[in-house]
Amino acid sequence: MTDYKATLNLPDTAFPMKAGLPQREPQTLQRWDSIGLYQKLREIGKDRPKFVLHDGPPYANGNIHIGHAVNKILKDMILRSKTLAGFDAPYVPGWDCHGLPIEHKVEVTHGKNLSADRTRELCRAYASEQIEGQKSEFIRLGVLGDWSNPYLTMNFANEAGEIRALAEMVKGGFVFKGLKPVNWCFDCGSALAEAEVEYQDKKSSTIDVAFPIADEAKLAAAFGVPSLGKPASIVIWTTTPWTIPANQALNVHPEFEYALVDVGDKLLVLAAELVESCLARYKLEGTVIATTTGQALELINFRHPFYDRLSPVYLADYVELGAGTGIVHCSPAYGVDDFTICKQYGLSNDDIISPVQSNGVYVESLEFFGGQFIFKANQNIIDKLVEVGSLMDTETISHSYMHCWRHKSPLIYRATAQWFVGMDKQPESGETLRKRAVKAIEDTEFVPAWGQARLHSMIANRPDWCISRQRNWGVPIPFFLHKESGDLHPRTVELMEEVAQRVEKEGIEAWFKLDASELLGDEAGKYDKISDTLDVWFDSGTTHWHVLRGSHPMGHESGPRADLYLEGSDQHRGWFHSSLLTGCMLDDHAPYRELLTHGFVVDENGRKMSKSLNNVVAPQKVNDSLGADIMRLWVSATDYSGEMAVSDQILQRSADAYRRIRNTARFLLSNLTGFNPATDILPAEEMLALDRWAVDRTLLLQRELLEHYGEYRFWNVYSKIHNFCVQELGGFYLDIIKDRQYTTAANSTARRSCQTALFHISEALVRWIAPILAFTADELWQFLPGERNESVMLNTWYDGLTEMPADFDMDRAYWERIMAVKTSVNKEMENLRAAKAIGGNLQAEVTLYAEESLVADLSKLSNELRFVLITSTASVAPLASAPADAVVTEVAGLKLKVLKSSHAKCARCWHHREDVGVNPEHPEICGRCVDNISGAGEVRHYA
């Protein structure tokens, strides 16, 4: 038997079937580094329009987790796609370096007795070490960036830039010193930003407390009774017994109805609507003897239960009837609403009673409870109320309560002297910050769109921004306050610039070691040099001003503006929020044109990642087991607008999809062997109809993909590329062209036409996958035929695809119909193979019985219809002639009948043909194969 293998154009490529990503990807990273890929991208991008994505800096602490990986991969996919779209899209990664978590780590390692200078020194060293670890992990994900020159908030230039930004805000009239209740953590010993507060369930003691009347005549008059006749008290309800020592007022709603209730030995004032529930709680019976409005009770004095001072009634709209008594006890030092109401009634900062120290312990001078930790004092306060006869009831409830995000410990509101940015404070010029921010939100694009309403509601309802902290490791607030008046030095802005210049050379240490006399001279004795530091959200929130400024030629004329900020959905109250406020203060607009938000990563059951649940997916392990490209493919395939589910099983599905894409690419490459694009490529008009359709279909898909890339809809990109590989290519085109590729003459038009199409498809495909499968695209690029530069990323989207003419006979709709027919034939073949009626498709002879228009379509392919259907013979007949046993298909007007061929099998092409053995020199092959080996070669027109 003759071996005809040498006469075939068998597929051949060195592109490996097995990806070996965990081993191959690090080698690719080394290659990118050795060729200076990022620098080359900047060189070729000099004259391109710029696209700037400003990196939200991750915190320099610990290894990266799956959420970090998602964030960095999304950014990289966007910037790679923008580069391929013809933009100069640099990526400067950043790190957030100051703040409590790092200071806490240093304290845990080295103890709490460090000097402030030593603490800062160790914090800087720790942050540097953490950055190097995270940097290598980000690079391993295939993220292209200026990793040699990242921006760090602890860089001296950035620390100085932050001080200059603050100086601009002081100059603009946005900053003020105030005594206000702020979120306070005893473990941190500092105020917390809104973004550092989380809510957990907490058990608390509730108490109903009676405050005895001081102005008996006024209370009687308010209720319209001649006299009280017996002791009377107003009753409050609270979940924070520890605030009772700081009580300074009692709040009622001006429009609610309040009742004077006789319970036998005394009178109680309660909200009329709550009398029944309150008396049941107190196990008392009583009679309502009079009612009045809250308005009538204003400024009536009651007595504190155990201190010799008065508690007047103030009106407050925030009082509710959902629980309690309808009267709220008011401690202005420990509640935002309480503070606001007391200020409205004329209490000065000096009037406000604030007995709780920064560590949560009452001052020693507080009568009865001095030196006690507030939460431990709750029971002692309850006991005192029992002793004085003021406790009406106590219960234990579980409720949602604010906790420190770092220590998980309960927080309190605590009035302290802090520095604030005023949301509604009138600046030196222009609108208030709140109005500016609301307008800026309206001018910003949001992906997904719901982010706009979320950020808007946060800005509309947020309090003034407390920007000061009482920590060591942070950018200083370099203010000098007059010792007597407490006012800022009149040359504050000028002095801040002098400090910034020193910080630029020596870092924040320059301020802390500064002697006031160096800047103030003889005035130094009159001023206090403050030691507060800036909120870390101010650090990252001002990076647009001192990192991004000047880097974007398309920026707003009044300041820098990034094209895109991209972070997790928690950053609506974090970086998006602080950046918006600083941008509106400094430049009167948001520092971004568009905000993109991605969801949190959860497991396949929607649960958060947790060591206790054993469901943590670590990116480092994925890199080592499957490869970063598999993780990148999972990110692209997942709709990031909601929660993003991941697990080993989900990643395995991504690996399966990856193999299908890789195998498609390998098939394309293996059939381009011997193809030189410089000499072998055919113009579109010389290509076979099916090949022209394949290139046209690729062009249509590319248009869709570019639109999806432009809208950051990567899951659409992934699904369409995957479907193209599996369906149009793997399930149709590539299956059909195998016979032509392998059996026709190597340099025949039939084969070169097909190779031309495969080349165009490959050139497009390698670019399509480059933003997602960064490593695989780079590998594929090295194996494509023809001269080419060092990386797919040094190119733009492929422009060599051609569209079929509008009047082309075998147009898009034609091939859609042919595909449907082929699908029906394939289904019947599968049934026959399962029944063992035939061994394979090429054993089949198929007759298609079709209605008139379909007969015309099928007949256009003439004797090449069998190559499209991949059968040994294929014939077409009118539908009316279909025998009774013809199979009805899903295609309207089509039946078919398949018979097993009785003809011999060609040893070369494996078709069963009548003319096998006709040529005595080649008794084992068909006439077509004889012609392809020793004759002029077969001529194909369509497929």
UniProtKB/Swiss-Prot annotation:
HAMAP family: Ile_tRNA_synth_type1 (MF_02002). Coiled coil: none annotated. It is found in: Cytoplasm. IleRS has two distinct active sites: one for aminoacylation and one for editing. The misactivated valine is translocated from the active site to the editing site, which sterically excludes the correctly activated isoleucine. The single editing site contains two valyl binding pockets, one specific for each substrate (Val-AMP or Val-tRNA(Ile)). Zn(2+) binds at residues 906, 909, 926, 929. Gene3D superfamilies: 1.10.730.20, HUPs. A motif ('KMSKS' region) lies at residues 608-612. It comes from the Bacteria. One of its GO terms (molecular function) is aminoacyl-tRNA deacylase activity. Its EC number is 6.1.1.5. Its cofactor is Zn(2+). Catalyzes the attachment of isoleucine to tRNA(Ile). As IleRS can inadvertently accommodate and process structurally similar amino acids such as valine, to avoid such errors it has two additional distinct tRNA(Ile)-dependent editing activities. One activity is designated as 'pretransfer' editing and involves the hydrolysis of activated Val-AMP. The other activity is designated 'posttransfer' editing and involves deacylation of mischarged Val-tRNA(Ile). GO terms for biological process: isoleucyl-tRNA aminoacylation. ATP binds at residue 611. It is an enzyme of class 6 (ligase). This is Isoleucine--tRNA ligase. It catalyses: tRNA(Ile) + L-isoleucine + ATP = L-isoleucyl-tRNA(Ile) + AMP + diphosphate. Binds 1 zinc ion per subunit. Keywords: Aminoacyl-tRNA synthetase, ATP-binding, Cytoplasm, Ligase, Metal-binding, Nucleotide-binding, Protein biosynthesis, Zinc. One of its GO terms (cellular component) is cytosol. L-isoleucyl-5'-AMP binds at residue 567. Monomer. A motif ('HIGH' region) lies at residues 58-68. Belongs to the class-I aminoacyl-tRNA synthetase family. IleS type 1 subfamily. Disulfide bonds: none annotated.
